[in-house]
Amino acid sequence: MDIVTGSTTALITPFKNGKLDESAYANLIKRQINNGINAVCPVGTTGESATLSYAEDKRCIEIAVEICRGTATKVLAGAGSNSTSEAIEAAITAQKCGVDAIFSVAPYYVKPSQEGLYQHYKAIAESVSDMPFMLYNVPGRTVVDISADTVIRLFDDVKNIYGIKEATGSLERTVELLSRRPELKVFSGDDAIDYPILANGGAGITSVTSNLLPDLKSELVKKALNGDFTGSKAINDMLFPINKALFIESNPIMIKAAMYIAGLIDTLEYRLPLVAPSVENMKKIESVMKNYEIKGL
């Protein structure tokens, strides 16, 4: 399998008059390609996937595949649900659209056991058995943690499961996983600890901040994977203020606001129950953004 590693961006989904802004979405993806991002990730948490219709979900993936075709940038598409059958349907749809790999968030709200998580992921991955497949662990949102034992079991038993996006915020979890299975591809799912995860054997990142600063995030990863840890850490340290500011409200509220302030999207629209940030937080993110050179479309 030709797996996806390196710098990946959890794409926002721009709306205009309540609908998917296809032109803006295409331009955002082109900007990622032009700034060296290894893969774009449509319809994940940052893309407000939980409030997209099935048709919108599919269209986002189709646009990403169309724009990335023939470039060095791949498409790592989201296909998650708290219903295993729905997640299988989403994974098969993504595969038919021509994506390069699939990631799937742990089922939220239903609080399955570790055995339930194992069976859930096994069923989804085996439904697209020739497609590279990544787990996505974000217990702060799903209220369930895919344990290290379950990750290892899935990696050992299911041939196309090659990695995990770790958004627990725990460096210890990454160290444990890689000490037990060095060949497992662990991605940082938390912008604040991208460098520590890469320095401890991580294979890549899935970033929110790279929507805004893809050039810096791409370079951070490239340096780390080439052994320039001093250079990678310097970029990570420089990005600390913006990484922090982008999460003062629930993601993707602040990254969308930042993209709007930067002129990278024309309208600041969310799907309920998400709403625009407070005036105070808009001022905070705008102030922090002044410290960075943000490249246009």
From Swiss-Prot:
GO molecular function: 4-hydroxy-tetrahydrodipicolinate synthase activity
Site (Part of a proton relay during catalysis) residue list: T45, Y109
Main location: cytoplasm
EC number: 4.3.3.7
SUPFAM superfamilies registered for this protein in UniProt: Aldolase
Superkingdom in the source lineage: Bacteria
GO BP annotations, alphabetical order: diaminopimelate biosynthetic process; lysine biosynthetic process via diaminopimelate
Sequence positions that bind pyruvate: T46, T206
Catalytic residues, chain numbering: Y136 (proton donor/acceptor), K165 (schiff-base intermediate with substrate)
Pathway: Amino-acid biosynthesis; L-lysine biosynthesis via DAP pathway; (S)-tetrahydrodipicolinate from L-aspartate: step 3/4
Entry-linked PROSITE patterns: DHDPS_2 (PS00666)
Keywords: Amino-acid biosynthesis, Cytoplasm, Diaminopimelate biosynthesis, Lyase, Lysine biosynthesis, Schiff base
Disulfide bonds listed in the record: none
Localization (cell): Cytoplasm
Reaction(s) catalysed (UniProt annotation): L-aspartate 4-semialdehyde + pyruvate = (2S,4S)-4-hydroxy-2,3,4,5-tetrahydrodipicolinate + H2O + H(+)
TM regions (residue ranges): none
Gene Ontology CC terms, in alphabetical order: cytosol
The family this protein is said to belong to: Belongs to the DapA family.
Function, as annotated: Catalyzes the condensation of (S)-aspartate-beta-semialdehyde [(S)-ASA] and pyruvate to 4-hydroxy-tetrahydrodipicolinate (HTPA).
Complex and partners: Homotetramer; dimer of dimers.
NCBIfam families named among the record's database cross-references: dapA
UniProt-listed HAMAP family: DapA (MF_00418)
Name this polypeptide is given: 4-hydroxy-tetrahydrodipicolinate synthase
